[in-house]
Amino acid sequence: KSKNYFSNNYFVFFSKEGSILVNNILMTVVCATVLLGTIYPLIVEAFTGSKISVGEPYYNSTVVPIIIPAILIMGIGPLMAWGREDKLKILEKIFPSLILTIIMTIAIFAVYQSFSLIGFVGVILAFWIISNNLIILIKKIKNFSKGMAIAHFGVGLLILGITGSSVWQNEKIVRMKIAGETKIEKYNIIFDKIDEVAGANYVAIKGNFLVYDSKKNIVTKLNPENRYYPISNIFTTEASIHTNIFRDLYIVLGEGNLNDGWIVRIYYNPLVIWIWIGSLVIFLGGIISMKINLKKLKILS
């Protein structure tokens, strides 16, 4: 439909086709930037023999500034009209989303009680996409793909999960003896006991850890293991994980003994589950869009 407007030889930024075009340009630049960061070290090595690496600082300084406006447009673009959209009408359309974004952002920072600029930007962008596409799905806005709205909703969940697990993660490495206690975030962890267990093809030392919240209510029991496989002569560590919608908490049992205690690694990763849920929602949105398009093709044929 947008080709009808481009055929008149003018371009309006505040329109659905304008947002699509700008977003496509931004995403193309992001892909080119990532590709450059991937192949540049190979090119340098091929011509000079020198080995260089392109790491996180490059992508943070190049990709992030480009992806932020793309995400903002992703939230507002679907609400715009074809051809030309009045600016006041745009504000009227996005006002509920702005309010919802502010409320959810305040709620998330109230839960984690830790502020950072990166976390603030990431959470705002995530809830901006989530709230806009949630409104689209609830209001059942005409001429808008349900599959696309679901996929964009999933992108918001994915960004939320990545932000939370990157900004608020915490880890602790301690040596603990039986009945020893340590704390990470709002959880108290007690090393209850050590058991020797035997599996079908291995023997193991299993740690028993009790996890309590700030009100001294037991949250879960975690049982990491150190396993030994005699036939293959291999030692492995098996982490024990407790997951909910707010965080992953897992413990890894290292080397040790009864006299000196054991090395214990404790990891606190917030919102990780939303990375997986967001990815599944994006996949679901793609399947729904494909199904709708196949139906349209059958009708046309």
Report the location of each language-model feature.
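Contiguous transmembrane helix-bundle modules in multi-pass membrane proteins
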Residues: 1-184, 189, 272-301
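Generic detection of intrinsically disordered/low-complexity segments and helix-coil linkers/edges
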Residues: 52-53, 222, 261, 268
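Short beta-turn/strand-loop junction motif enriched in small, turn-promoting residues
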Residues: 163, 194-197, 269
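Soluble non-transmembrane domains of integral membrane proteins
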Residues: 173-262
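Individual transmembrane alpha-helix segments
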Residues: 259-275
